Amino acid sequence: MDERRTPSPCSSRPSSPRTPPCEMFGPVGIEAVLDQLRIKAMKTGFEFNIMVVGQSGLGKSTMVNTLFKSKVWQSPAPNLDVPMPQTLELHSVTHVIEEKGLKLKLTVTDTPGFGDQINNDKCWDPILSYINQQYEQYLQEELLITRQRHIPDTRVHCCVYFVPPTGHCLRPLDIEFLRRLCRTVNVVPVIARADSLTIEERDAFRSRIQQNLKNHCIDVYPQQCFDEDINDRLLNSKIREQIPFAVVGADREHIVNGRCVLGRKTKWGIIEVENMAHCEFLLLRDLLIRSHLQDLKDITHNVHYENYRVLRLNESHVLPRGPGWVNLAPASPGQLMAPGPEKVRKRSKDPRDDEC
């Protein structure tokens, strides 16, 4: 029986060939390319699309505002007269953030209603459908014969999953969600409201979560198979040891010892968001913005979107020609909610992979 093969995410990112260096007689100005890239980046800016998933009351909106130090997302005031939504609803908001002349077009997608129902069966389907709809929209734009010079990128580059601070282990809902979504999008789990746990409880909770992820073969970002060199391996190994980050969100400033800090004021003191002794928010911000933002976008395009594109092209046997463009057969709801490949092949065989 013929078995349909899914593309390998790792094989979608070809490694650079080992070409011997050429001896040069003098400088030719190659370093000026960096200036060209910088000037172009200053003109066009960047796009980054992030999704936050978690139950109500875990501080998702506050965390997004804290990450970008802007009022990106306004939390609606609690209203007891408004009934809880019976279905998961996705809401997106887009802002342009500018820092030192560089513009970032940020789109944040919230998922109110996730995990809030008595029966949460298949509550991940709307999220999975939304992610694949963005892939489908980008694919349809790519297939146009006369297409835009710059295709608008609405694909989700990162999904931050907020784990409730129960102090025990991952719930079945958490495991099922992570297992399905990790095949389709970059997922970064965090321990929400970590100030409700002691340092000992937090470390023990993290260890149990890491063991849960290993037992269920859930490969969250950054995946080991994407480490391209020794520097990536060293940096990402430290990150993998600390995931999920224990975070606290706050968008208000307080005066502590004569300095202004972001934090939450409590009866026993102020929890400083940017103090590693209080929480690991800095690690999350460094991962999402300062060190891995472009890598998140590259993996989205070269791995997750490429998997979706190849599967859609394989499933569409006929490509009917329209007036000036080529259109795939419409994606069915089942295709939009289908998870990605079960398992990815590694560049080099790792004996630890056999455990999964």
UniProtKB/Swiss-Prot annotation:
Chain positions covered by the region annotation Self-association (via N-terminus) to polymerize octameric septin 12-7-6-2/4-2/4-6-7-12 filaments: 256-356
Molecular function as annotated in GO: GTP binding; GTPase activity; identical protein binding; molecular adaptor activity; protein homodimerization activity
PROSITE patterns: G_SEPTIN
Major subcellular location class: cytoplasm
Location of this chain's protein in the cell: Cytoplasm; Cytoplasm, Cytoskeleton; Cytoplasm, Cytoskeleton, Spindle; Cell projection, Cilium, Flagellum
Subunit structure: Septins polymerize into heterooligomeric protein complexes that form filaments, and can associate with cellular membranes, actin filaments and microtubules. GTPase activity is required for filament formation. Interacts with SEPTIN6 and SEPTIN11. Self-associates. Component of a octameric complex consisting of SEPTIN12, SEPTIN7, SEPTIN6 and SEPTIN2 or SEPTIN4 in the order 12-7-6-2-2-6-7-12 or 12-7-6-4-4-6-7-12 and located in the sperm annulus; the octamer polymerizes into filaments via the SEPTIN12 N- and C-termini; the SEPTIN12:SEPTIN7 association is mediated by the GTP-binding domains.
Residue numbers spanned by region Interaction with SEPTIN7: 44-317
Positions bound to GTP: 54-61, 87, 113, 193-201, 249, 264
Signal peptide: none
Region (G3 motif) location: 110-113
Organism: Rattus norvegicus
Keyword rRNA-binding appears in the UniProt entry: no
Protein name: Septin-12
Key words, A-Z: Cell cycle, Cell division, Cell projection, Cilium, Cytoplasm, Cytoskeleton, Differentiation, Flagellum, GTP-binding, Nucleotide-binding, Spermatogenesis
Cellular-component GO terms for this entry: cell division site; microtubule cytoskeleton; midbody; perinuclear region of cytoplasm; septin complex; septin ring; sperm annulus; spindle
